[in-house]
Amino acid sequence: MCKIGILFENRDFEHDVYELIKAFYPEAEIHTLYENGEAEYDLRFSVERDNDSYIIKYERTENLSKQETEQKGVISADILSKENAGCGIQDAHALRKENKDNIKYALYQLLVKLTGRTLPWGNLTGIRPAKLAMGMIESGMKNTEAAREMRERYLVSPQKTALAITIANREREILKDIDYENGYSLYIGIPFCPSICLYCSFSSYPLKVWEKRTDEYVEALCREVRETALMMKGRKLDTIYIGGGTPTTLLPHQIRKLLDTVGEAFGYEGLAEFTVEAGRPDSITREKLMAIREYPVTRISVNPQTMNQETLDVIGRRHTVEQTKEAFHLARELGYDNINMDLIVGLPGEDIHMVERTLEQVRELAPDSITVHSLAVKRAARLNIFKEKYQEMSFENNQEIMDLTMKTAYEMGMGPYYLYRQKNMKGNFENVGYAKVDKAGIYNILIMEEKQPIIALGAGGSSKLVFDHGQRIERVENVKDVSNYISRIDEMIERKRTAIATWL
């Protein structure tokens, strides 16, 4: 494994430099350094400030690829200070962004030279490219001007630029009636799952271990629901999203208790969207779907991730392809007319032919939307923790696969409506939601674009309070551990009350 050291004179832009280098060397062991040491590295970078420039130097002890021929080099990126920022930049936030963009532009050019390759999303290391595109358009730029900015300033490929601009415009149309100033959305988390997937890093807990305490969890959650509704009185609730985990691990009477409480506390009138992520096919039953159907739920998800049985077995999803089809048909039979299906590309052992097989079977089911995720292996996932066990597995994702998913979505009458990126994504690609007309997931857009507050309830819930028209975001975290959430529910409520009081 390649070993890379990055020496920082100070911590300015440390995260951005690290993430961009990691994107070019995804398999490398990368160390951040704050003083010179004796350790040996295959490639060493140093980042230091020199008056109105940042100087980035590199040196390596051996070639890391055939394209890398130079052993040493240096680049500089001009920066602005408050004194010399005579270009209309008024605030510290904008000044920092300008300097960050300049450093990443120069570093990206160096990394392209070193490795002989480019990245589809250029020097963007954040997770919300469409938010960047939307900001440009809302500032008054024409589509062509925003596209040129993304290509020339951020070095995004023409294909990804077109995707971001297309999605930004569709998001604007979908959100045109949402009140950002007075409205908010509600997320309710159910952290239990029938089993934990190989790639999962979310706060999910095996149902078999926790099934004797699910009543306690629902009771604590209902208490948080009631108290939060009082805090938000006078504000308009736009969307509700019940996710997880797997919400349908709850029994029918627990589902009814939760949804009764939400309705009594917040009311269901005037909602733009109400989603329940039914999720894993092995947890979906007629009784549970009928219970959900008693409430004004407008959208559900049935999530196979793949329609290849051998892959399902490898990743620890203890259901069959046939169960996915049965759950989907059952939902249609019961009258659900807006069903999403989540898919993952880049799963272990899957090549383009297996992805094609999945897409063909999904096409036959004819969902109203699909969300295509590129596999991202987080630190907390079993796939990463026990990576030596899985090192012989292949993880294939490429532009051809991404093009195939888009082509299939278009053939099914769907267009892209939201996208986001994650760290450590296979192929450095993206997650894209596709939907038919009037079937897009509004909550999905709102949480990505950070246009309005998201109030999150349940274990592991992370509320986002939006200040200054999205210029500042503050998070309010609930504890992740289920036992702690139950025992410390009063503390979670007070934590939320204090934060919301400062926002209101």
Regions found by a protein language model. Give the residues of each.
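Beta-strand scaffold of nucleotide-dependent catalytic cores
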Residues: 189, 301, 370-374, 444-445, ...
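Short beta-strand motif preference
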Residues: 56-58, 188, 302
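N-terminal [4Fe-4S]-dependent radical SAM core
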Residues: 115-118, 138-186
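Radical SAM enzyme core and accessory elements
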Residues: 1-143, 152, 221, 437-504
